[in-house]
Amino acid sequence: MAILKWKLSRCYSSNEVSSPEIIRQHLANHPAATHTKAVALGTEETQTTIQRPRSEPDTGNPCHTTKLLHRDSVDSAPILTAFNSSHKGRINCNSNTTPIVHLKGDANTLKCLRYRFKKHCTLYTAVSSTWHWTGHNVKHKSAIVTLTYDSEWQRDQFLSQVKIPKTITVSTGFMSI
């Protein structure tokens, strides 16, 4: 803030105008305010903020429906579903979802299991590396591997043909891609 005051005082040389007044004048003349903050090793990071007027619809998102363009909150807007979908889960607006399986368990067990999946490569589309959730409220530090499929049929074939150890938890679902 002190740097902004100093820069603005150089632009507005009047001694009779207070610092808050200088800032208000500057922001009135420059709708895109630039904020500068100091970061490590004497470098600077600059961020420009431009606010769009509330009455202007957001056209950058292809998922808007006519209901959302009328400025309803997202929570009150209807959930979009695909009419030709074979699953009953929630689908995003372009129906670009894929069936998935999360395998949860010991990290080393999942890593070895991932390599055993290579001989069943026709039964899944992709398999992730071993990952885990982080955060303050995470109670279980179990590792996770995610598998994606082209269809629910392919996922069912995978689950019926591939032996999963009893120590691994299997969760099925859908993921937007």
From Swiss-Prot:
GO molecular function: DNA binding; DNA-binding transcription factor activity
Coiled-coil positions: none
Subcellular location: Host nucleus
One GO process term, biological-process aspect: regulation of DNA replication
Primary localisation category: host cell
UniProt cross-references to InterPro entries, sorted A to Z: E2/EBNA1_C_sf, Nucleotide-bd_a/b_plait_sf, Papillomavirus_E2_C
Cellular component GO terms, alphabetical: host cell nucleus
Keywords assigned: Host nucleus
Similarity-based family: Belongs to the papillomaviridae E8^E2C protein family.
Quaternary structure, from the entry: Interacts with host NCoR/SMRT components GPS2, HDAC3, NCOR1, NCOR1, TBL1X and TBLR1.
Function: Plays a role in limiting the replication of viral DNA in keratinocytes. Recruits the host NCoR/SMRT complex to viral replication foci to mediate repression of both viral replication and transcription.
Protein's name in the database: Protein E8^E2C
Native organism: Human papillomavirus type 16
